[in-house]
């Protein structure tokens, strides 16, 4: 009975979304995107698309999303939004971070990316335009991937903070007490594999088109670079997402070393009480800001 009701609610929600979608004006970018997509399919093999296409998407988006935070350090106006104002970025730390990123991206992540083609072949994941999902189904699946990754990340991240193993693996990521965007994937190779597994679980369970791989990469990079940015920017549209952790939530984890273990959402920290120190800190901060107004 409950299952039938759930299916009925889901069907009604799908119909409602489809109806709203039919009322929206036609996307002027759809035709150019369709032509570009078909050009890619006609001129490159599936292996090239899945491997080199995925690598280009990851590298281009990673450093593009890092760029605003990198530029903020040169803009005096933005300093008031920096969370840990007493710990500015240094060229030495950023250069060290960049070198480790290149190693992780090309020596750890690239071999994993090379398996993308074989994954799509094994599970018969389509590439063609005709079977590309509608935007709302794509967003729904990306949200599902985010929930799965966040759950994996919370428990494995918390495990990596265990006193017996912390110094061997996760300590690398905590070398910078005040995070900055480029540091999002600065980690021990084993951590890259352990926490990165959460990214792929959602893909294995939910992927119905190769575009989901790239859409999920885009969302995950945007989120992880945002929470590592070190800046709490007003009117950040990501903060409109219910239960979104945000930069202050994760910045406290780097500052305090314990608590706030989740990557994207706040519910696991709230359920297990691992945000108690953060909540106390936040209350003190807000009281102090009121006094100084």
UniProtKB/Swiss-Prot annotation:
- Membrane-protein topology: Multi-pass membrane protein
Question: Could you mention a single GO BP entry for this protein?
Answer: steroid metabolic process
Q: Which residues form a coiled coil?
A: none
Residues in Fatty acid hydroxylase domain copies: 145-274
GO MF terms, alphabetically ordered: C-4 methylsterol oxidase activity; iron ion binding
Q: What is its EC number?
A: 1.14.18.9
Q: Where are the transmembrane segments?
A: 55-75, 100-120, 199-219
Q: Motif Histidine box-3 at which residues?
A: 249-255
> Where does this polypeptide localize?
Endoplasmic reticulum membrane
Any GO CC annotation of this UniProt entry: membrane
Q: How is it modified after translation?
A: Ubiquitinated by MARCHF6, leading to proteasomal degradation.
| InterPro entries hit by this protein | Fatty_acid_hydroxylase (IPR006694), Sterol_Desaturase_Related (IPR050307)
Residue interval(s) of motif Histidine box-2: 170-174
What pathway does the UniProt record associate with this protein?
Steroid biosynthesis; zymosterol biosynthesis; zymosterol from lanosterol: step 3/6; Steroid biosynthesis; cholesterol biosynthesis
Renumbered to this chain, motif Histidine box-1 spans 157-161
> What domain notes does the record hold?
The histidine box domains may contain the active site and/or be involved in metal ion binding.
Family statement drawn from the similarity comment of this UniProt entry = Belongs to the sterol desaturase family.
**What this chain does, per the record?**
Catalyzes the three-step monooxygenation required for the demethylation of 4,4-dimethyl and 4alpha-methylsterols, which can be subsequently metabolized to cholesterol. Also involved in drug metabolism, as it can metabolize eldecalcitol (ED-71 or 1alpha,25-dihydroxy-2beta-(3-hydroxypropoxy)-cholecalciferol), a second-generation vitamin D analog, into 1alpha,2beta,25-trihydroxy vitamin D3; this reaction occurs via enzymatic hydroxylation and spontaneous O-dehydroxypropylation.
Q: Which disease is it linked to?
A: Microcephaly, congenital cataract, and psoriasiform dermatitis: An autosomal recessive inborn error of cholesterol metabolism characterized by accumulation of a large amount of methylsterols, particularly dimethylsterols, in affected individuals. Patients manifest psoriasiform dermatitis, arthralgias, congenital cataracts, microcephaly, and developmental delay.
Name of this chain's protein: Methylsterol monooxygenase 1
Query: What's the source species for this entry?
Result: Homo sapiens
């Amino acid at each position: 009975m409950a299952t039938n009701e759930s299916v009925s609610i889901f069907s009604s929600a799908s119909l409602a979304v489809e109806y709203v979608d039919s009322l929206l004006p036609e996307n002027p970018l759809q035709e150019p995107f369709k032509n570009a997509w078909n050009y890619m399919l006609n001129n490159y093999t599936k292996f090239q698309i899945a491997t080199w296409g995925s690598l280009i998407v990851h590298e281009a988006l990673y450093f593009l999303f890092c760029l605003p935070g990198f530029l903020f350090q040169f803009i005096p106006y933005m300093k008031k939004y920096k969370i840990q104002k007493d710990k500015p970025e240094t060229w030495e730390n950023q250069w060290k971070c960049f070198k480790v990123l290149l190693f992780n991206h090309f020596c750890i992540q690239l071999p994993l990316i090379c398996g993308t083609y074989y994954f799509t072949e094994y599970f018969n994941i389509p590439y063609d335009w005709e079977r590309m999902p509608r935007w709302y189904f794509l967003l729904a699946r990306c949200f599902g991937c985010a929930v799965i990754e966040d759950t994996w990340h919370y428990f494995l991240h918390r495990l990596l903070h265990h006193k017996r193993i912390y110094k061997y693996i996760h300590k690398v990521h905590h070398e910078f007490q005040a995070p900055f965007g480029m540091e999002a994937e600065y980690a021990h190779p084993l951590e890259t594999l352990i926490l990165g597994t959460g990214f792929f679980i959602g893909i294995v369970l939910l992927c119905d088109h190769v575009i989901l791989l790239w859409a999920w990469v885009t969302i995950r990079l945007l989120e992880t670079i945002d929470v590592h940015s070190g800046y709490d920017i007003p009117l950040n549209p990501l903060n409109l997402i219910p239960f979104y952790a945000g930069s202050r939530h994760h910045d406290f984890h780097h500052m305090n070393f314990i608590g706030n273990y989740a990557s994207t959402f706040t519910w696991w920290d709230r359920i297990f009480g691992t945000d108690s120190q953060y909540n106390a800190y936040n209350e003190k901060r807000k009281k102090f800001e009121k006094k100084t107004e």
